[in-house]
Regions:
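Amphipathic alpha-helical dimerization/coiled-coil segments
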Residues: 21-24, 101-120
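Canonical helix-turn-helix DNA-binding module
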Residues: 49-91
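Basic, amphipathic "hinge/linker" alpha-helix immediately C-terminal to the N-terminal HTH DNA-binding motif
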Residues: 85-104
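N-terminal leader segment of winged-helix/HTH proteins
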Residues: 1-31
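N-terminal helix-turn-helix DNA-binding core of bacterial DNA-binding proteins
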Residues: 22-62
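Intrinsically disordered, low-complexity regulatory regions
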Residues: 2-9, 97, 115-119
Length: 120
């Protein structure tokens, strides 16, 4: 078995992403999983309406996976579920002011990391 360290040429994208993640970990914001963050970004960046079924299809995961992520994101106030009054089997997923504020802050963190990297 090989034990020597693998060398990797750092890419700008990975270095910037690392800087963003370190800043996020150091913030007071709750840790989100990659699935939760992907779900949140789809709801905020892709025109809706969004349903649990549609989000599961978009992310290529099961509806229970989306439901678990929505439970967490809903408890944080980042997303809200609303029943479709015309078809009670459908659940719409909607944006919230808290979710908008979170993503604005996260976007700012990415921008600051990118600017810091550009100065180097």
């Amino acid at each position: 078995m090989r034990t020597e360290a693998l060398e990797m040429t750092p890419s700008t994208s990975l270095s910037n992403w690392m800087g963003t993640l370190i800043g996020y970990v150091q913030s007071a914001r709750p840790d989100l999983t990659n699935r939760q963050m992907a779900l949140l970004l789809v709801v905020y960046l892709v025109d809706g309406p969004h349903t649990v079924r549609g989000l599961a299809s978009k992310l290529k995961v099961s509806k229970p996976v989306v439901t678990r992520a929505l439970n967490t994101l809903g408890a944080l106030g980042y997303l809200r579920r609303q029943k479709d009054e015309s078809d009670l089997r459908n659940i719409f997923v909607e944006r919230t002011p808290q979710g908008t504020a979170f993503l604005d802050e996260f976007s700012g963190l990415i921008d600051r990391t990118d600017r810091a990297a550009a100065r180097q």
